[in-house]
């Protein structure tokens, strides 16, 4: 089965081709036009997707050495994301599938991230064995989910304010770093002292997401942002410049330690033997190293996507579509799917909480 995946939920225009579960191409174009604004401008993102979508899809087909007539299925992100951006890829994918008279599969962007850790591990659309805890962490989302082997899942934790990636970007902006600041902080931190300054770690006392789950798995990063701002206001520009790697390392430690502690605690509380991380922040080297070490200490299997599948990409869209089709979990031949803005609105199962 040959699947074309399309992803346009934010500021990456991506198309990928999978053949029997193997990635044949994964073309990603990141929009640089937002850099001067310090964040993504929705209108600009939509226009860039519209400008690039045809050439990106053509490149994906060409690299996979196939034509559009060789495709069996087309899948595209239907949300959550910037509605205008989502609509570009969704409408393009639906129209293309309709014209080719082949099935179209709408994909939940966050669900695709959840399963992106298994792109290189599950050829031929084999589902992961057993349950796992998934940490999906990016600039827009910080979610902890208990994923069951039948593809149902419960969201057991989420951020109560800022997402982890947003915390990286906002503290980076305070430090005068370019957008997106997460990768820059990661690089600076390699030469810094993570114990230079003890920024607060928010370990919220009571869960507001899943009252039935044992333990609290919610996150909060707004206090960290305020603490960094207060700390920097007390320092001279010379001090900040001299200790920039140390401050970056200290900020990173505060964010990563909470992510690791909450995720591992959730696995232990639920007696789950596997953990996966996904989303743009999963590319952070400290998060990968710390989570792997913690999993090894507790005998928990650790799954993480290759670097190219951590950020938004169409390979994960096509991969999840293949998994869902193989297990007969999605309707086929629907060409009138509307985009959705929230994670909850796009869940596949009504029983999910």
UniProtKB/Swiss-Prot annotation:
Keywords: Acyltransferase, Cytoplasm, Iron, Metal-binding, Transferase, tRNA processing. InterPro entries: ATPase_NBD, Gcp-like_dom, KAE1/TsaD, TsaD. Its main location: cytoplasm. One of its GO terms (molecular function) is iron ion binding. Fe cation binds at residues 109, 113, 312. GO terms for cellular component: cytoplasm. Its cofactor is Fe(2+). Binds 1 Fe(2+) ion per subunit. It catalyses: L-threonylcarbamoyladenylate + adenosine(37) in tRNA = N(6)-L-threonylcarbamoyladenosine(37) in tRNA + AMP + H(+). It is found in: Cytoplasm. Its EC number is 2.3.1.234. Required for the formation of a threonylcarbamoyl group on adenosine at position 37 (t(6)A37) in tRNAs that read codons beginning with adenine. Is involved in the transfer of the threonylcarbamoyl moiety of threonylcarbamoyl-AMP (TC-AMP) to the N6 group of A37, together with TsaE and TsaB. TsaD likely plays a direct catalytic role in this reaction. HAMAP family: TsaD. PANTHER family: TRNA N6-ADENOSINE THREONYLCARBAMOYLTRANSFERASE, TRNA N6-ADENOSINE THREONYLCARBAMOYLTRANSFERASE, MITOCHONDRIAL. This is tRNA N6-adenosine threonylcarbamoyltransferase. The lineage of its organism: Bacteria, Pseudomonadati, Chlorobiota, Chlorobiia, Chlorobiales. The gene is tsaD.
């Amino acid at each position: 089965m040959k699947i074309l995946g399309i992803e346009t939920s934010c500021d990456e225009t991506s198309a990928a081709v999978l053949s029997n579960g193997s990635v044949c191409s994964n073309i990603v174009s990141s929009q640089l036009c937002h850099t001067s604004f310090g964040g993504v401008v929705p209108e600009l993102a939509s226009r860039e997707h519209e400008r690039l979508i045809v050439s990106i899809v053509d490149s994906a087909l060409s690299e996979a050495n196939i034509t559009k007539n060789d495709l069996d299925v087309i899948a595209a992100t239907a949300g959550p994301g910037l509605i205008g951006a989502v609509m570009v890829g969704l409408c393009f994918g639906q129209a293309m599938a309709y014209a080719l008279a082949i099935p179209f599969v709408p994909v939940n962007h966050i669900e695709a991230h959840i399963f992106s850790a298994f792109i290189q591990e599950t050829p031929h659309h084999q589902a992961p064995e057993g349950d796992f805890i998934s940490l999906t962490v990016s600039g827009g989302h910080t979610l902890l989910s208990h994923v069951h082997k039948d593809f149902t899942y419960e969201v057991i934790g989420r951020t109560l304010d800022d997402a982890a990636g947003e915390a990286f970007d906002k503290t980076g902006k305070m430090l005068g770093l370019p957008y997106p600041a997460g990768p820059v902080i990661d690089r600076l931190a390699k030469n810094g002292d993570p114990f230079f300054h003890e920024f607060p770690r928010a370990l919220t006392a009571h869960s507001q997401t899943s009252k039935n789950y044992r333990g609290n798995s919610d996150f909060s990063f707004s206090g960290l942002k305020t603490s960094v701002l207060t700390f920097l206001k007390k320092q001279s520009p010379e001090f900040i410049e001299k200790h920039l790697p140390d401050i970056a390392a200290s900020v990173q430690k505060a964010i990563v330690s909470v992510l690791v502690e909450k995720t591992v605690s959730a696995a232990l509380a639920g007696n789950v033997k596997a953990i996966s991380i996904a989303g743009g922040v999963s590319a952070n080297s400290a998060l990968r190293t710390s989570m792997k070490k913690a999993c090894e200490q507790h005998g928990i299997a650790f799954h993480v996507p290759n670097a190219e599948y951590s950020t938004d990409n169409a390979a994960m869209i096509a991969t999840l579509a293949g998994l869902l089709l193989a297990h007969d979990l999605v309707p086929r031949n629907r060409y009138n799917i509307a985009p959705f803005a929230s994670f909850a609105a796009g869940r596949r199962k009504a029983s999910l909480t």
